[in-house]
Amino acid sequence: MTVQAENTAPPRLINRELSWIELNARLLELAEDPSQPLLERVKFTAIVSSNFDEFFMVRVAGLLEQDEAAMGVRSVDGLTPGQALESIRVRVAELTARQSRLWKRDLRPALAAHDIEVVSLKDCSERELKRLEAYFERDIYPILTPLAVGAGQPFPYISGLSLSLCVTAVDPETGEERFARVKVPEGLDRFVSVGKRLVLLESVIGHFLPVLFPGMDVTERAYFRVTRDADFDVSDDADDLLEAVESELRRRRFGDVVRLELSASASQAMRDRLIEGLGVRPTQVYDIEGPLDMADLWQLVSLDRPELKDEPWVPVVPPRWARMKSPTRVFDEIRRGDMIVHLPYDSFRASFEAFAQGAAHDPDVIAMKTTVYRTSDDSMLTASLIECAEEGKQSVCLVELKARFDERRNIEMSRAMEQAGVHVVHGFADLKIHAKMTLVVRREEGGLRRYVHIGTGNYNAATARLYEDVGIFTADEDIAADVADLFNHITGFGRPQRFRKLLVAPFDMRSRILAEIDRVSVAAAAGKHARIRLKLNQIVDPVVIEALYAAGQAGAKIQICARAICMLRPGVPGLSENISVRSIFGRFLEHSRIYAFEAGEETTYLIGSADMMPRNLDRRIEVLVPIENARARQELAAVLDSTFSDTTNAWILAADGTWSRDVASGAKAHPHQLTMMRRAQQRARRGDRGR
């Protein structure tokens, strides 16, 4: 039964899932923006599709489980699972229809105008069809397997996110109608070249279907795609975490179907067959007018057409790093004073990877410990850890096996490092290790000294070129001691009694964040300067949100930049009129977590891995580090000033949960990311000794 979604949510909170969907709406608006380079618009369109895939695999899957279990309990925003699902269905259908229209009416014609022509087979010449027929017979036909349904043949297993054709064929002699499924091969390019033009792979298969069904009349074909539940839980009692995760990965392949995407042209009979065979509700079916799975548009984005893309950005080598004659000099520089790095404006390779290489090459280094949540295949960090192990240094890597959709990569990386002699630790079954921290121990005059890096982003060279993040390199003794204690807690399961400077979840981070908010509230009530500025990915935690409401009511000015989910309602009279919320999108993904609490003349700056969500504060190992170095604090202040001044790629959240783009032109235009790029270049030209 379809549940009508009444808006019974209390005014204090915005629904989490609906807030996330609006992230995709903002991305789609960028894709629609004609001022963006054409292939960047195509890229944003592809990201919308891949984002929705993950959303259905995890969030919608969980809501369906709750709804099927008749769990009518309302979430903190006031919606039941059924109401949330109906609201999601309506909004996702709107956005996917808008995405299809964008492709058909705008992007595809614009690409054709630049000689990237994606055509249907009916527009192909006889010569082009001959070439496609040869390609089909040589490269496609040998790997196709039509699977009939009925007459003793069960409905076939359909793998998650795979693209398929459903086919109805009639025997001309008996009039018997048969139904079959043909999977589109995953190892072939989605866009097939035919001369200077491109056609979709599934349309080539659809055109030559009679070859697969000789002696039958193909009466209907349509394209479909299923999304399966991909979330999993590992038992807290698991003796071998790696083995338990591997077992769950095998099970995940057979998760329940949570979404069926289907060509809008499919007949009702074909639709009914798929609904019955896949065991889904009619409300889980999404009609698609254009191509299914637009995430494959990345193939077009990868074309060598620089004039249709953003001008390439070459990360700057920060001046203090540029002066180093060898990687081993990094420790001398850190001793001179903390160094902050702002990615991707600053170079990841010249900073963090140089730090890791320095640990591997320096004969005075005796130990290196790090955390890995997501990393790249060509990671210099893992190479440095292996080199440390081969040199007889203590080399420890805490690998989070439950990093969603990177589980397989992390398992393989763990085994490779273990075989090379690295001590690999997988942490806890019930707590993800999400902290980004590295500890290097060095033998120096006067004894051992520890060096630390703590950041907001993953140690991943690929994403470091695309994601905006910050990190600090320090030899502060208290911070280093805290990091060492935390590593020992994770590897040895001892419980730290207290932390000197770090805020660590799930131990004291929540209470200390609330204490910082309260400190600002007290200052506001006393008539002193009181401001909170939060730059993060998501703000979901109801307790933190209520504390922010209270601080705003006390008179504090609160500015929030949330990239994705924001359940806080800004601008509500009597509740949150002193709170403003924005979101910034551009060529780089805003990923850093920077927190500033200003009370009177005292300001606390924090950076780290944690968003303001219950999972980050209560169910993960997370770290926030206070920034005390004056130059580093100035840099963070500049980042926040620019963030909250953007008038080019900022969206503003209204009290009703809607977002609107804040666009200015001429002298009033302030593009945050471009400002940061110019700032990095100017700093490098000046040889700024503070960085």
Regions of interest found by a model, annotated:
Residues 557-561:
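Hydrophobic alpha/beta core scaffold segments
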Residues 544:
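Polyanion-binding catalytic cores of nucleic-acid enzymes and NTP/SAM-utilizing transferases
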Residues 1-532, 550-554, 566-691:
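N-terminal localization/anchoring segments of enzymes in phospholipid and broader phosphate metabolism
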